[in-house]
Amino acid sequence: MAEAPGDIERLIELMARLPGLGPRSARRAVLVMLKKRGAVMAPLAQAMAEVAATARDCARCGNITSADLCDICRDDRRATGELCVVEDVADLWALERAGVFRGRYHVLGGVLSALDSVGPDELRIPRLAERVRDEGISEVILALNATVDGQTTAHYIADVLEPSGVQVTSLAQGVPIGGELDYLDDGTIGAALRARRRF
């Protein structure tokens, strides 16, 4: 079986490092790019070079931006008293796609993890406490994933912020829209029952 030339094989190996792309998917993607060099590969390479040169973390919230502050932090129409804490930028983007939250964000950059030796100083938790103190935040919404590390991080943040008197809330957990009880795990059903509200 013929192998791809070395430089193309290197590109395939790099593509395979991306989440959701295994070796076969990466190979197919590279073949499509090679087939459509002018329409796909060249613009993609240019866009990647531009983003690599300009992308950085927002100085205030940790979102990805090409300026000192991201568009959300610069938006004067945002509610300045509400601060939504997320694990990473993908979570921020998911909340923005929903189009419901009109406050500001704080990206932690991960979660506390004893196994991975990730402590509060490796995350943006000290910066979060500063923002609550300095920006007049009235509510911190913890929008962290319902994993053991996510919930450990949420409890830690609540403890850190308790002396400030800020209201700390978390996202409701339970039955997803369109979900059927028979397909849900026991933990999700229990969380939904505990978070029930008047109909």
UniProtKB/Swiss-Prot annotation:
Positions of disulphide bridges? none
Presence of keyword Coiled coil: no
Describe, by residue range, where the zinc fingers (C4-type) fall in the chain.
Answer: 58-73
Pfam families to which the protein is assigned, alphabetical = RecR_C, RecR_HhH, RecR_ZnF, Toprim_4
Q: Which SMART domains match?
A: TOPRIM
Domain of life, per lineage:
Bacteria
List GO molecular-function terms, semicolon-separated: DNA binding; zinc ion binding
**Which biological process terms from the Gene Ontology are attached to this UniProt entry?**
DNA recombination; DNA repair
Q: Does the keyword Zinc-finger apply?
A: yes
| Keyword annotations from UniProtKB, A to Z | DNA damage, DNA recombination, DNA repair, Metal-binding, Zinc, Zinc-finger
Residue ranges occupied by any Toprim domain in the UniProt entry: 81-176
- What family does the entry list? Belongs to the RecR family.
Functionally, this protein is described as follows:
May play a role in DNA repair. It seems to be involved in an RecBC-independent recombinational process of DNA repair. It may act with RecF and RecO.
Q: What is this protein called?
A: Recombination protein RecR
Q: Which organism is it from?
A: Cereibacter sphaeroides (strain ATCC 17025 / ATH 2.4.3)
Query: Which taxonomic lineage is given here?
Result: Bacteria, Pseudomonadati, Pseudomonadota, Alphaproteobacteria, Rhodobacterales
